Amino acid sequence: MNVIEINSENYKDYLHLDIIAFSFAGEGAQGEGGGLWMVTSDGKLYHTNFAYTISWEQAILLCPTLQTCDCDLFRTTPPEGWQSYYMGGGNFLIVKDTYTEIFSQLDPYDLYGQWKDILIEKIK
């Protein structure tokens, strides 16, 4: 699977992505702190890190829905039109409502290492 890496030098090239799902690690989470993984409607996978690679402000420009999620350690409340899945260890998956059926039969704790592959396979 090809991953397009976004950094502070190239993030402006990706400001208009049609993001259908993204995951991030909340404060104190296990895994990649600040990691932001995004899948677009054309099945492309993007990655950045708002703790080390880009600023929080740049991350919000890339993925505006991220700013509207109300998060704490164990839950997040996404904006209308999106669904949240807690994947354990402080990791969250946020999916557009039109794509949630793909994950409806899966245990959210099983999504952590698999959601990107599952989603991309279904939309390609």
Stretches with model-predicted labels:
Residues 1-13, 34, 49-77, 103-124:
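Short glycine/serine- and acidic-residue-enriched loop/turn motifs that recur at repeat junctions
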